[in-house]
Amino acid sequence: AEWGRIPDHIIVGLFNPDRNADLVPANDPRYPGTGNGDAYLQHVNDEVLPLINERYRTSDVRLLFGHSFGGVMVLNQLLTGPGAFDGYIALGASTWVSDRVLFDRLEAVDPDFGGAALYMAVGETDGGATVPDGELFAERLDALEPQGLDWVFEIRPGENHFTNVPEGLHRAIAFLYPFADQQAE
């Protein structure tokens, strides 16, 4: 932001005393307590965002970032309330969780995303079904022929579930703000 390549930002991190419950929208018996994700997003949209806007100097541009189950939360927000944020960053999203509930929501979504952007990436050696289900989610999103959604899905070579985050976040910022990656003159 100092060099004028991206707008000023404030970063808000939200504590999750029960991340499984807060981030996953439907019950998954493998992860006790899951299934409160929709209520958590409602809390973020109805209470947290207005509080941030009241207390801090903000703009109308909002980005949402999440990793792993947090990536599920990001994609769930995109599919169930796409107007709340302008940019979505989902890294290592566990799209397989809760019997692929996000796939069901993807099939039911209105394909007009109103001008949002999505950067989605998994590490090449991300465990379990994260890579194949991430690819399948991207294929199904592409098949929707989404309107008003600038998006990209990447499999990050040599990266795993955790090492994907720092470089993935950098690549997401460069994708969302194309001038962010240029050298200062």
Feature locations, PLM:
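Non-catalytic cap/lid and distal C-terminal segments of serine-dependent acyl enzymes
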Residues: A1-E185
